[in-house]
Amino acid sequence: MKDEAIERWAIEQLDKKKGKSTKQRKNYLPYIKNKNMHRRTFIKNSSIAAAGLIIQPSLAFQEDPILGQGNKRYRLNNHWSQADVARNPVNDCHEMVQDSKGRIILLTNEIKNNVLIYDKAGKLLTTWGSEYPGAHGLTIFNENGTEVLFICDNNRHQVIKTTLDGRVLLTLDYPKETGQYLKPEEYIPTETAIAANGDIYVADGYGKDFIIRYDSKGRYIGYFGGRGDEPKHLLNAHGVCIDNRDANRPCLLVTSRQQNAFKRYTFNGEYIDTIPLPGAWVCRPVIKGDYLYAAVLQSSSSLSKQSGFVTILDKNFKVISNLGGTEPLYLNNKLQEMKQAIKYFDYPHDVCVDDEENLYIAQWNSGKVYPYKLSPVI
């Protein structure tokens, strides 16, 4: 396979980009860490990693293991979902949120049922959606007392706002108003964040790495970020969220995954600073209480080898626990490289924190597994 035809699946899009043209796949080349790695190399490495589970039975088959360090330790349940795989399959489990009724909402790119809604015990309550082949980002927002969802679809190159039962309220097409996009295929949104005033921030994490801002009606306001060599620039802007933990200085928190970092911006897009997370290919930041949670898709030291874990930071952006990862170590106030320590996860893609502080982990390209649940250890 020629280098120019190498697909971006080596990082995140292995399955759902099948069928796209070589020209479209070129959008993903900037993210490939090693452009000599092609499909059979990835499969070989994945097979080797999977074999590692077979020769480590104490890890692979330990019942209800406890993961993490310090006061953020959790007991793992990898059989949480009670869904019938024949009736309600999943492909990539991309993101999860909890609604005000306590239900856990899962987004998958399986078009038999894009959205699966569970109770906290893992019972499947209902499903909907067959029109989101590239379902990737899922955000919930309380809009004047009514909860709504925002879905980012990689394949459709759109952001879709819906009711909790799937009725479409608004569709945002590619942001030609920016002057940065010639066609929809250049725009591959991965995440949204909604400000208190209803402004919508869209992360073009698999496209050109801009953060595009709209008002609550979907009218274009502006953009920032994008690729470049300055600190304000982004590389794989996979996620974005609103961080209100400092009431005097609320901000946007944006993933720059290939740089192993989060970056902070004002709501007008002015760069504030960078939170380095060496070794961690972080997905979207998730804020709950004083803490920041993030799935780590893979470790920099073991790319494309099912080397993910989950990281937790305190309100000062200090890593305090890694679930399935090495214990965080700071030398002279500098965080040292983190990586997977025990293979309980393959490619974690999102963390949902419920109202009882339980965690739900959605995984990409991990054998079509349903989400895992982790309960706090007191």
Q: Where is each model-derived feature located?
A:
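Blade/loop signatures of beta-propeller domains
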Residues: 61-78
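Surface-exposed loop and turn segments in beta-propeller and other repeat-based domains
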Residues: 78-87, 170-183, 221-232, 320-343
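Loop/turn-rich, solvent-exposed surfaces of beta-rich toroidal or solenoidal domains
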Residues: 280-326
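Conserved beta-propeller blade signature
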Residues: 104-106, 148-150, 200-201, 251-253, ...
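Blade-level signature of beta-propeller repeat domains, shared across WD40, Kelch, NHL, RCC1
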Residues: 347-378
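N-terminal export signals
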Residues: 41-60
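Beta-rich, blade/repeat-based domains predominating
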Residues: 86-101, 131-145, 177-199, 229-251, ...
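Short loop/turn segments immediately following the C-termini of beta-strands
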Residues: 109-110, 154, 205-206, 245, ...
